[in-house]
Amino acid sequence: MEREQFKVLVKAMKAVYAQPTFIPDQDAFNVWFALLRDLPYKQAELAVQKHMATEKFPPTIADIREKA
C-alpha cells in the first residue's frame, strides 16, 4: 500500500476512535506504515473496516494484520 492510502485508513480510524493517544504523531505514523505497507491496500482497508465495525477499542498493528 502507498503512504497516501495508509493516510486515508488512519483518518478513518481516528474518526471512529477519537483518542489522542492513537497514532499521536508522525513518528508513530511512520512505524505503523513501515509495519503495514506490505499489505495490499484493499486487504488493509477491509481489515480496518472489519475492526471498526466489531471492536470498541482501536486496533493494534497485529489486529489489522490478523484480520487482513
Where are these regions (language model features)?
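Charged interaction scaffolds used for protein-protein
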Residues: 1-68
